[in-house]
Amino acid sequence: MEFPFDVDALFPERITVLDQHLRPPARRPGTTTPARVDLQQQIMTIIDELGKASAKAQNLSAPITSASRMQSNRHVVYILKDSSGRPAGKGAIIGFIKVGYKKLFVLDDREAHNEVEPLCILDFYIHESVQRHGHGRELFQYMLQKERVEPHQLAIDRPSQKLLKFLNKHYNLETTVPQVNNFVIFEGFFAHQHRPPAPSLRATRHSRAAAVDPTPTAPARKLPPKRAEGDIKPYSSSDREFLKVAVEPPWPLNRAPRRATPPAHPPPRSSSLGNSPERGPLRPFVPEQELLRSLRLCPPHPTARLLLAADPGGSPAQRRRTR
């Protein structure tokens, strides 16, 4: 396949490996390209044209390989170029093969389901003008060595009859294990364990950043120590202790006279009324005659003397009767 730009300058090696980023490979020393030329756009054009040619050769309604699909999936494409025939000195593309790891549920010889993640052949195309010249085997063998897998460990997505004959001719893959999906696996597929897919570029980038500039993680939050379980007071005890506290009433009630504090050792309670500790002892009984005698002997008050001096004519008995 020919293109209007220099393919030989874009792909220095005979076989070029591209991932989802579609970055141009390193250029040879001394090779110059104008700055205005977008190399990634040229790569996207090549992949789109190869996908269309492959879909046409397999009688597919739409291409299964395109630059946009490559950028949205973790697939790898191997592109084979022809440097011998240099039409207009720009080189040409012979074909490509696209692979990628996929998680599949496949049946074994006992029809048991197995969850595997093998390397899958997703698209394979060699230009019609250069078929049966060994280019397909060269490209396929290079992919096996680069991915470090054996032919019987592969799973092929909807292979064409040409591809099945190719695998039978060059790798003796003939007996298939029936599946319920569109993938084809061959006898010996379960004999070896499949290599897990490479870590994602994002995870690799994060791990490298952590190695260069490790960020200290926040310390784990410590929980407060659990209190030792002691004797729990009953609710009634708490109430009694609360009532023991003397609460002073607000002003002016707090100025009222308080009751006298009872003696520390009160006298023993007796059935006698005179000995009652609550009412106290009564005064002894005084006869009426003695009370009157004490009043007569008591000197008069100064005020009474003044009244007697103001009324000398009246006798004390008369004054006592008129009052």
From Swiss-Prot:
Quaternary state and interactors: Component of the BBSome complex. Interacts with AP2 alpha-adaptins, including AP2A2, but not with AP1 gamma-adaptin (AP1G1/AP1G2); this interaction is required for efficient alpha-tubulin acetylation, hence clathrin-coated pits are sites of microtubule acetylation.
Primary residence: cytoplasm
Positions carrying Omega-N-methylarginine: 323
Keyword Membrane carried by entry: yes
Cell compartments where the protein resides: Cytoplasm; Membrane, Clathrin-coated pit; Cell junction, Focal adhesion; Cell projection, Axon
Protein's UniProt name: Alpha-tubulin N-acetyltransferase 1
Skewed-composition ranges (Low complexity): 209-220
Source species: Macaca mulatta
Ranges of residues in domain N-acetyltransferase: 1-190
Phosphoserine found at: 272, 276, 315
